Amino acid sequence: MYGYGYGGGCCSYGGYGYGGCGYGYGRTFALIVVLFILLIIVGAAYLGGGCC
């Protein structure tokens, strides 16, 4: 489920505007990026005691 794009069937897997075939990660890559950004935001808010 992670590295389909570089082999066959990359286009059929699809992606969120990452081009499926071009990057080869598709939804999994987008999901990891979103989770990573959320983790950074939550971590910064927790360690910094809030945004304000």
UniProtKB/Swiss-Prot annotation:
Bilayer topology annotation: Single-pass membrane protein
Keyword Transferase: no
Pfam families registered for this protein in UniProt: YjcZ_2
Chain ranges passing through the membrane: 29-49
Keywords: Membrane, Transmembrane, Transmembrane helix
Main location: membrane
Places the protein is found: Membrane
InterPro entries found in the cross-reference section: YjcZ-like
Entry GO CC: membrane
Family label: Belongs to the SscA family.
NCBIfam families: tiny_TM_bacill (TIGR01732)
Official protein name in the record: Uncharacterized membrane protein YkzV
